[in-house]
Design a protein with these regions (language model features):
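N-terminal cap/lid segment of alpha/beta-hydrolase-fold proteins
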Residues: 1-16
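Short, surface-exposed "cap/lid" segments of acyl-processing enzymes
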Residues: 14-54
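Alpha/beta-hydrolase active-site loop
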Residues: 64-86
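Gly/Ala-rich beta-loop-alpha elbow adjacent to hydrolase catalytic centers
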Residues: 95-104
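Hydrolase active-site cap/lid region
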Residues: 106-148
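The feature captures the conserved acid-bearing segment of alpha/beta-hydrolase catalytic domains
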Residues: 130-135, 140-186
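Active-site-adjacent alpha-helix of alpha/beta-hydrolase-fold enzymes
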Residues: 179-200
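C-terminal catalytic histidine-bearing segment of alpha/beta-hydrolase fold enzymes
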Residues: 196-234
Length: 234
């Protein structure tokens, strides 16, 4: 599917006989560049519905684009799940990286209750993440935005109302050397999920930056998904 804010593509065999993974690419990474990671998940036995997002979500320096993007992807995921369920698919999980992780953070729980397990490949405060990227900080500052104003604009996205997450299992992959979404800040991101009843584990990946943390998480994708889907088999 094509939309002005995102594109999507499906990979793998019939979803009826396999678990389905909702896969959201990192910021500014098209599906084409994530194909290796996607193929490894398909070989591990998953049907994959992949999404890529427009870089304009941040390069346009308009904070209203992000909530619109999340809303549209949520709507599309709901439609995909309903269609796949009608074809016999029963299990739905996710794998999101960087911005994709934040988008899926706003999809679990009451928004899309079918997503009961999955992987957040890096995660944290989205406003600080944007502000920690010099090019994006410059673009937003030129439009009159400051870090406090961005945090205010995205406050509802940063603290979504999950409802209850009892029985949900999530894995967060992170690195203490990630300067964009550092491991030391992840507790603020996890605590609301823990309070809502989810089982959450943290996996530290070897990395020297946000980019390499994301790449390491993608490479370990099948292992991280197993940790979330069937923790006793890892």
């Amino acid at each position: 599917m094509q939309d002005r804010l995102f594109q999507s593509e499906e990979f793998g065999t019939s979803a009826k006989a396999t678990d389905t993974l909702i896969f959201v690419c990192p910021y500014s990474v098209p599906i084409q560049k994530a194909r290796l990671a996607i193929r490894r998940l398909v070989r591990a036995g998953y049907h994959v519905v992949a999404y890529e997002t427009t870089s304009a979500v941040f390069t346009d320096a308009d904070p209203m684009i992000l909530p619109e993007l999340i809303s549209r992807i949520r709507q599309d995921i709901r439609s995909r799940i309903a269609e796949l369920a009608s074809e016999g698919a029963a299990e739905f999980g996710f794998f999101g990286s960087s911005l994709g992780s934040f988008i899926l953070y706003n999809c679990v729980g009451r928004e899309i209750p079918e997503l009961r397990w999955g992987v957040f490949n890096t995660g944290g405060n989205i406003a600080r993440g944007v502000w920690n990227m010099p090019a994006l900080r410059q673009l937003h500052a030129a439009r009159g935005w400051s870090l406090p104003r961005l945090e205010e604009a995205w406050a509802e996205l940063q603290q979504p109302d999950f409802g209850r997450l009892d029985g949900c299992r999530f894995v967060f992959a992170s690195s203490r050397r990630d300067s964009i979404a550092p491991l030391r800040d992840i507790s603020q991101y996890l605590e609301p999920m823990l309070q809502a009843g989810a089982e959450v584990s943290v996996y530290e990946v070897p990395a020297i930056s946000h980019r390499t943390a994301v790449i390491a998480g993608l490479w370990k994708g099948p292992q991280l998904v197993r940790m979330a889907r069937r923790p006793n088999l890892v």
